[in-house]
Amino acid sequence: MRFSNRVALVTGAGGGLGAVIAERLAREGLTVAVNTRARTEEADAVAAAIRAGGGRAFAATANVTDPSAVRRMFETVADRGTLRVLVNNASYRPRQRVQTITEDDWHQVRSVTLDGAFRCIRCALPTLIPGGRIVNVLGRNALAGDPERVHLSAAKHGLLGLTLALAAALRDDGVAVNAVSPGVDTEGPELDRCRAEIASQVARLAFADAAELTGTVVRVDCDGSVVSAPTVW
């Protein structure tokens, strides 16, 4: 095992891509905190599957839009070990025509996708410094606008900006901050292979040397190609 008594927290891990990422990190030897918003049975099922496969995992239910719930979640994580990896995967992805998006719709998407990531990062930093790893999951919405998810595209692009700014801010603290950007929509059972490729890249970034790899967006196009390059504006 690479880490002993080390924890990775994966948000939005009750199913789909988040669950696959959680399973992959557990195979790498990390204890995984499986976060879901409110459906404890989903987190319990993913954690149980990891344990059945010989890994270590536990449920960590919290709505990332609620600062108090996020703080309590990190207290639970601290009771299980030392947090070394944070994967911000939670997002809210409604399809809406831009003409129908209300103020509440806009703020709800941002509160989960962007603000939720910031809340988790803020709580994680005391234990991530020094030497921790943050991996943010973007998506094609961040790099190419989605006409049916304008609010999500804006929030994911904000998460890209947060990734780059944090990489610069935390470099001297030995914390690597990177992002993975799936090139396709990761919803649907037909994309199991794609999810595995994405999870593999998340695991690579979780163990990357901060001095060599930070402020990088890894684009996974799910056709066998991976593009990894620093993003410079």
Regions from the PLM with identified roles:
Residues I121, A155, T163:
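Active-site helix of classical SDR
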Residues R97-V98, D105-R110:
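Substrate-binding pocket helix/loop in short-chain dehydrogenase/reductase
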Residues P126, A168-A169, A211:
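Alpha-helical segment proximal to the catalytic Tyr-Lys
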Residues T40, T61-R72, E103:
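The beta1-alpha1 cofactor-binding region of Rossmann-like NAD(H)/NADP(H)-dependent oxidoreductases
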Residues L30-A43:
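Conserved glycine-rich Rossmann-like NAD(P)H-binding loop of the short-chain dehydrogenase/reductase
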Residues V7, G14-G15:
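Conserved glycine-rich cofactor-binding loop
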